[in-house]
Amino acid sequence: MYIVVTRSFPPEVGGMQNLMWGLTCSLAKYNLVKVFADFHENYKEHDQKVSFSIDRVAGIKLLRKYRKSYLVNEFIKKNKNVNCVIADHWKSLELIKTTKKKICLIHSKEINHKKGSFANRRILKAFNNIDQVVANSEYTKNLAVEIGIDENKIIVINPGVFPPKEIDKSSIKEAENLLKNKNPRLITVSRFDKRKNHEKVIMALRNLKQIYPNIIYTCIGYGEEEENVKKLTNELELNEQVIFLKNVPQGLKNALVSKSNLFVMPSIIHKTSVEGFGIAYVEAAQYGIPSIGGKDGGASDAIKNNETGIICDGNNLEEIYSSIDLILKNNSYLEM
């Protein structure tokens, strides 16, 4: 039996949630699986449909961690057939007291603390009691080694995605109506977060508009930087060139990606926040859409530079602009 301890799980929406869902479903095809996940408002309807057992843990964040660890420890004591505990965050394993094998996924942001700091010492103490570390990219592995995690414990497994589902005709039609008479078409699907770098794309769009008067940029997502990005769009008089969407059904999201020419997310490092991999690039590639990613972080594991897209310096506005222009002018990218 495998125990999965996670802070990110459906029905909550997001890249980490999709990753942990995919991992758990794949494990459950061949093994018994028990999940300990955070409470979510609509969890009952979701959890009734799955083939494995899920315990939901509610309460404020700090107490939730202790309660979840207690439940996991008690479950292991009562179930001798547990082989392994897998977690999506080192904090989820920090209080697990067992000799069973422990595996921790790492993504970069959560371990990116200065060597010797209190947070770093706490991280290293936790990883001393973890048997296997799975990094989502070479970048994340190198970061882990740099901060002091034992390299011999680390393997790199790039996150996977489920095969794309056929997009229903109504979603295709809705996407085509939203993008009608607009070309070329850029898209970003992500949280509005500083490291995602929406602002630089908007700035590049101002110049691209001079060459491509019918250009459109679709932004799907939500987050703390949303209002700042909208304000910049308004200041640069690009309201006709940018569409903001949130709470978009999966079918429409996939349709909008498939009907776009280019996925754009030239991520940067912001404080300790960094893009460890970028599953969204892979999801775009499933529909034959090239991507532009940033050189800072693990995007180069998801994008084959000058083949499936371009890796550029996300801090350099001219590089972002020229990378977008190059792909839009080069049919070999658009005919992937």
Where are these regions (language model features)?
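Acidic anion/phosphate-binding donor-loop and adjacent secondary structure
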Residues: K114-S117, V145, V161-N177
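Acidic donor-binding loop of glycosyltransferase active sites
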Residues: S258-S273, I289
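N-terminal strand-loop element at the rim of the active site
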Residues: T6-V13, L19-R64
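Carbohydrate-associated surface elements
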Residues: Y139, G160
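Short His-centered aromatic/hydrophobic patch
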Residues: I86-S92
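Nucleotide-activated donor-binding/catalytic signature segment of Leloir-type glycosyltransferases, i.e.
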Residues: I220, K230-G251
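Conserved acidic donor-binding segment of nucleotide-sugar-dependent glycosyltransferases
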Residues: K304-N306, I310-E318, D325-S332
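Conserved donor-binding/catalytic core segment of Leloir-type glycosyltransferases
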Residues: V134, L178-K196, I202-L205
